[in-house]
Amino acid sequence: MSLSAKDKATVKDFFGKMSTRSDDIGAEALSRLVAVYPQTKSYFAHWKSASPGSAPVRKHGITIMGGVYDAVGKIDDLKAGLLSLSELHAFMLRVDPVNFKLLAHCMLVCMSMVFPEEFTPQVHVAVDKFLAQLALALCEKYR
């Protein structure tokens, strides 16, 4: 499932609109991830609190959205653009790749809640495809 030129334009446009609330979306998406999929808390055992809405979860959610925005800027070559993040997650953090898909789903839910009018079916498809390609790029070094 590759991204067409129209998909890329749609993603860039939507993320431009979303920039004012991206921190909130990142924090809420990660909060939902640890609440709905509690096994993901194991990656954050070193935090004082990995509870939904806690300060460390919010901070890391913001960091994640920063990475997603970086990926939007590298949308034409995600695998090459995200190679260092792939290495980090594969070799140092040892994140199970399935978690990228789970987080992507939580992001979609949050985006649709915060931007119900802008999150049209066309935007949904384009952003879903983008997040799937992003997850695939992050898995590059797992092979």
Swiss-Prot record:
Q: Where does O2 bind?
A: H60
> What's one GO MF term for it?
organic acid binding
Q: Which GO terms describe its cellular component?
A: blood microparticle; haptoglobin-hemoglobin complex; hemoglobin complex
Give an example GO biological process: hydrogen peroxide catabolic process
| Domain Globin residue range list | 2-143
Superkingdom as given in the UniProt entry? Eukaryota
Please tell me where heme b binds in this chain. H89
Question: Does the entry feature the keyword Cell wall biogenesis/degradation, yes or no?
Answer: no
Q: Which residues carry this modification: N-acetylserine?
A: S2
Q: Name one Pfam family in it.
A: Globin
Keywords carried by this UniProt record: Acetylation, Heme, Iron, Metal-binding, Oxygen transport, Transport
Q: In which tissues is it expressed?
A: Red blood cells.
Q: How does it assemble?
A: Hb 1 is a heterotetramer of two alpha-1 and two beta-1 chains.
- Which protein family is it in? Belongs to the globin family.
Summarize the protein's role: Involved in oxygen transport from gills to the various peripheral tissues.
Q: What protein name is recorded for this chain?
A: Hemoglobin subunit alpha-1
This chain's source organism reads Boreogadus saida (Polar cod)
| Name of the gene encoding the protein in the UniProt record | hba1
